[in-house]
Amino acid sequence: MTNETDNRCRKTVLIVEDQALMRQTLRDFLQDAFPERIILDVADGASARETCKTHRPALVLMDKCLPDADGIELTAQLKQLYPGMQVIVMSCRSGEIYVQRALAAGARTYLVKDNLTTDLIPMVAVALGIAPATDMGTS
């Protein structure tokens, strides 16, 4: 990887979300909060694998339920291939079992979509090393 490519990778965030409206909402939030970042988005696990291989994003926002993959299992696969990549698993489902599975798979944290407007930007800032980690826990 060249220095230019490496810099671009460190600035890239990938959204993996099958619902088009949610994907666009996430993109809008991230572009407003982090205008210097490159925001990519895909709708399924296969596209996520390919995009990670090609672009090596610094951060992946991973939907738990994808049409062709379980987002937590996909997180584990991506973390094996790209250990330095940060992953935030997102779901409409809350519950300690989901949080524990996501963390065990290598996710940095687990975001319940009901808390998106309050928790997304701080979680992303911490994952990207822009803000210091605090004891936010998981939402």
Spans of model-derived segments:
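The feature encodes the CheY-like receiver
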Residues: M22, P67, G95
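Acidic catalytic/metal-coordinating carboxylates
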Residues: D44, D70-E73
